[in-house]
C-alpha cells in the first residue's frame, strides 16, 4: 500500500515551524508516522514549490518538491506529474539528482529529492558572468555522462538548461527536473509535443512536424556550452517570437569581446546544426578536440570556483607542458572580478542559499510538454606551497571506456587543521573554500545574528598584520531580510544589501558612499552623501545603515579591540563580495584582500598587495563552537 501523509503546523515564539507527517502503512504492522520539518524555500515553478526538508528521525536534509493538488485539476497536468515521478524514480546515476521518496495527503504531493546546496549553473553564471574553458569542459563531461545514461534508458530530458543543472556538496553536476522528460517505447520513436525553454529549445521542436528525439538534448547541450563560455544564450532576444525566428535560422555569433578557443567554437557549431541527423552523437562529442584529452580536465572543480575563476597555478596542473603558463615562484593569490556573492533579484544566494530546483527561465509547454571540499593538510602545516596540488587530489583525470562511461575513485576529504599559533607564509595558488551553502535559520532578533571576528582573535591578528592592514572586525548577518552589516578595523561601517548595492560610512569624514552596479555590468556607480543629506529613495537604506552602525558599535563583541586608523587610501575600503558557507564566512574587500572566518574561530587573510597569507589561530580558552 502506498504511504499516505497528513501535514500539520505548530508555532513557537521565534518562527513558524511546519511539520509534515507521513502516515506509513505496512502490511502486517500498525501504521507509523514519519515526520519532516519544512525549512526555507529553495525555488518555485508553475505547479510546485521546493523547500529544504529535514527528516526528523535520521536528520537527513532533502529537497522537498511540494505540488498543490488544486493545481492539478486538468487530467494533462496529473498525467505530466505521474510521468515525471515514474521516470525520475527509475533513474539512478551519479549525475542525476537522486529521487528519494514520494507521498501525498489530501492537499499536496510531496517529492523528496537529493539536496544540492551549491545551487545551479544558472546561479553560478549570475555570479561569475562566464566560465573558463576548463570549467566548461569539466561540467560538459559530467553532463554528457548523465545524458548517456538517460538516453540508454530511452529517456529524453527535453528541458536541459542552466537552471536544471545543480551542484551538490562535492561539486558534482546533477541533472534535475524531469517534468518535460519523455520515455520512448522503441528505438526510432518520435515525439511531437512542443515543450522546453525558449532559449534552449531545438528548431525541430518549434517546427513540430516531423517530431523529435534524443537530438534535442544535444542541441540544448550546445546552447549550454555557449552560454557558459559567453555568459548569455546564443539566440536570446527580448521577444520570444524573435528568439524562435533566430533558432529556426540558426542565427547566432560569438562576440568579439569574449575570448573563446577555435575548438570550443567548432564544437558548438557542430551541435547547433539545424538538421538533427547531422548533429554529433554524445560519443562523437567526447572525441571532439575540445573534450578528447580528458586526462587534462579535472573531474570536479574546487569550491572556490563558485566565487572566482581557477588560479593560474591550478590551471597549470591540467595543462600540457608545452601549453603551461609560466608563473613567478611566489605569486600573489589571484582574485578575479566577479559578480557579488550576495543575493541577486530573488536574494537566493545569501538569503536562502538553496539549490534552484526550477531555475529562473520560463518553461513553455503547449500541446501536440561536503561533504565539504577542503584543503588536505598536515596537522602541523596550515598553508604550504603544495596547497594547489592538494586541491586536485582525487579529482584529476577522466577514464572513459569505449562507450564513454567513466570510473572515479574520489579520495576522502580531511578537515582543515590549524596550528596552535598564528603564522604568516608566502603562498601561491588559490584556497579551496568550504562548499555547503546553507543560510542560518531566520531569527526575529537582529542581535542573535551577530558574528564577530573580534576580541577573541583580534589580539592574535594584531601580531601578524601590519599597522595599515584593513580587515572585517565584526559583522551581523541579516540577509534574510536586508543584507549584511559590518565594521572594518579602520572604523568604517558598511552594509551589503540583498539587491547588491552597498553603502559605506566613513567615521573620519562623516561621508556616506553609495555604490550601485552600473548598467550592463559596467563600472560601478559611486555617489557620496552625508548622514543628513541624501535622496528620499535612500531613506530606508540610510536608516538601516544607522541601525547596523549603532548595533555593531554598541555590541558586547570585540569592544576591547582598538581601531586601526589605516591610511587615507584605505578609508575607502569596503566589502565588495561575501558568501556564507557551512564552515566559513568569506569576505572580499575592495582592496582585493580576501578574509575567511571559519566556524572554529580561526581565520585566514590573503593580501594580494604584499603577497601575504595570514593565519590567525583561536585562543586556547575559546570554545570551538561559535
UniProtKB/Swiss-Prot annotation:
Location of Phosphoserine modifications: 71
Residues the entry annotates as binding ATP: 42-50, 65
Polar residues compositional bias, start-end: 400-427
Keyword match Repeat: yes
Matching InterPro entries: Kinase-like_dom_sf, POLO_box_1, POLO_box_2, POLO_box_dom, POLO_box_dom_sf, Prot_kinase_dom, Protein_kinase_ATP_BS, Ser/Thr_kinase_AS
Domain POLO box: 471-554, 574-626
Active site residues per record: 159
Pfam family, one: POLO_box
Ranges annotated as spanning the membrane: none
Catalytic activity: L-seryl-[protein] + ATP = O-phospho-L-seryl-[protein] + ADP + H(+); L-threonyl-[protein] + ATP = O-phospho-L-threonyl-[protein] + ADP + H(+)
EC number: 2.7.11.21
SUPFAM superfamilies: Polo-box domain (SSF82615), Protein kinase-like (PK-like) (SSF56112)
Disordered, as annotated region: 399-433
Keywords: ATP-binding, Kinase, Nucleotide-binding, Phosphoprotein, Repeat, Serine/threonine-protein kinase, Transferase
Ranges for domain Protein kinase: 36-291
Leading EC class: transferase
GO MF annotation terms: ATP binding; protein serine kinase activity; protein serine/threonine kinase activity
Tissue specificity: Embryo.
Any one annotated GO CC term: nucleus
Family, as annotated: Belongs to the protein kinase superfamily. Ser/Thr protein kinase family. CDC5/Polo subfamily.
Function text: May play a role in the division of some cell types.
PANTHER family, sorted: CELL CYCLE SERINE_THREONINE-PROTEIN KINASE CDC5_MSD2 (PTHR24345:SF0), SERINE/THREONINE-PROTEIN KINASE PLK (PTHR24345)
Protein name per UniProt: Probable serine/threonine-protein kinase CCRP1
The organism of origin for this protein: Zea mays (Maize)
Amino acid at each position: 500500500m502506498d504511504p499516505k501523509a497528513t501535514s500539520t503546523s505548530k508555532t513557537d515564539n521565534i518562527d513558524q515551524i511546519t511539520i509534515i507527517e507521513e502516515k506509513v502503512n505496512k502490511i502486517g504492522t500498525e501504521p507509523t508516522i514519519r515526520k519532516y520539518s519544512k525549512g526555507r524555500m529553495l525555488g518555485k515553478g508553475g505547479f510546485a514549490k521546493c523547500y529544504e526538508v529535514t527528516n526528523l528521525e535520521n536528520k537527513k536534509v532533502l529537497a522537498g518538491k511540494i505540488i498543490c493538488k488544486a493545481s492539478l485539476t486538468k487530467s494533462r497536468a496529473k498525467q505530466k506529474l505521474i510521468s515525471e515521478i515514474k521516470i525520475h524514480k527509475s533513474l539512478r546515476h551519479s549525475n542525476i539528482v537522486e529521487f528519494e521518496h514520494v507521498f501525498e495527503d489530501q492537499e499536496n504531493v510531496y517529492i523528496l529529492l537529493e539536496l544540492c546546496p551549491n545551487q545551479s549553473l544558472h546561479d553560478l553564471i549570475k555570479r561569475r558572468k562566464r566560465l573558463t574553458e576548463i570549467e566548461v569542459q569539466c561540467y560538459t563531461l559530467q553532463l554528457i555522462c548523465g545524458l548517456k545514461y538517460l538516453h540508454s534508458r530511452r529517456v529524453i530530458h527535453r528541458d536541459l538548461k542552466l537552471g536544471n543543472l545543480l551542484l551538490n556538496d562535492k561539486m558534482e553536476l546533477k541533472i534535475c527536473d524531469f517534468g518535460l522528460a519523455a520515455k520512448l517505447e522503441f528505438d526510432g520513436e518520435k515525439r511531437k509535443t512542443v515543450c522546453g525553454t525558449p532559449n534552449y529549445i531545438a528548431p525541430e521542436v518549434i517546427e513540430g512536424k516531423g517530431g523529435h528525439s534524443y537530438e534535442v538534448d544535444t542541441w540544448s547541450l550546445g546552447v549550454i556550452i555557449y552560454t557558459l563560455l559567453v555568459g548569455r544564450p546564443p539566440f536570446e532576444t527580448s521577444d520570444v517570437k524573435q528568439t524562435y525566428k533566430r533558432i529556426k535560422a540558426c542565427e547566432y555569433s560569438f562576440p568579439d569581446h569574449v575570448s573563446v578557443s577555435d575548438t570550443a567554437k567548432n564544437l558548438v557549431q557542430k551541435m547547433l546544426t539545424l538538421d538533427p541527423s547531422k548533429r554529433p552523437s554524445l560519443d562523437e562529442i567526447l572525441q571532439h578536440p575540445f573534450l578528447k584529452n580528458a586526462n587534462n580536465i579535472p573531474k570536479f572543480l574546487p569550491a572556490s570556483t563558485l566565487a572566482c575563476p581557477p588560479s593560474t597555478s591550478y590551471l597549470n596542473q591540467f595543462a600540457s607542458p608545452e601549453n603551461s603558463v609560466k608563473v613567478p615562484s611566489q605569486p600573489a593569490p589571484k582574485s578575479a572580478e566577479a559578480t557579488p556573492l550576495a543575493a541577486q533579484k530573488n536574494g537566493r544566494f545569501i538569503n536562502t542559499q538553496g539549490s534552484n530546483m526550477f531555475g529562473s527561465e520560463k518553461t513553455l509547454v503547449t500541446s501536440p510538454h561536503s561533504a565539504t571540499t577542503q584543503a588536505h593538510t598536515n596537522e602541523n602545516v596550515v598553508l604550504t606551497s603544495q596547497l594547489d596540488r592538494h586541491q586536485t587530489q582525487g579529482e584529476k583525470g577522466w577514464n572513459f571506456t569505449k562507450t564513454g562511461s567513466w570510473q572515479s575513485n574520489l579520495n576522502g576529504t580531511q578537515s582543515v587543521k590549524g596550528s596552535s599559533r598564528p603564522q604568516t607564509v608566502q603562498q601561491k595558488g588559490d584556497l579551496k573554500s568550504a562548499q555547503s551553502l546553507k543560510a542560518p535559520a531566520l531569527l526575529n532578533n537582529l542581535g542573535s545574528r551577530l558574528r564577530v571576528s573580534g576580541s577573541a582573535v583580534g589580539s592574535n591578528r594584531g601580531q601578524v598584520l601590519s599597522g595599515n592592514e584593513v580587515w572585517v572586525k565584526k559583522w551581523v548577518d541579516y540577509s534574510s531580510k536586508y543584507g549584511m552589516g559590518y565594521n572594518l578595523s579602520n572604523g568604517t561601517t558598511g552594509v551589503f544589501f540583498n539587491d547588491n548595492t552597498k553603502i559605506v560610512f566613513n567615521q573620519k569624514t562623516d561621508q556616506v558612499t553609495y555604490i550601485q552596479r552600473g548598467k550592463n555590468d559596467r563600472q560601478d556607480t559611486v555617489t557620496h552623501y552625508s548622514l543628513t543629506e541624501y535622496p528620499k529613495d535612500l531613506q530606508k537604506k540610510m536608516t538601516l545603515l544607522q541601525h547596523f552602525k549603532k548595533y555593531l558599535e554598541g555590541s558586547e563583541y570585540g569592544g576591547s579591540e582598538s581601531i586601526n586608523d589605516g591610511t587615507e587610501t584605505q578609508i575607502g575600503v569596503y566589502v565588495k563580495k561575501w558568501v556564507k558557507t557551512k564552515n566559513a564566512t568569506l569576505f572580499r574587500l575592495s582592496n582585493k584582500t580576501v578574509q575567511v572566518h571559519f566556524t572554529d574561530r580561526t581565520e585566514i587573510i590573503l593580501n594580494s598587495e604584499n603577497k601575504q597569507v595570514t593565519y590567525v589561530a583561536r585562543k586556547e580558552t575559546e570554545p570551538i563552537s561559535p
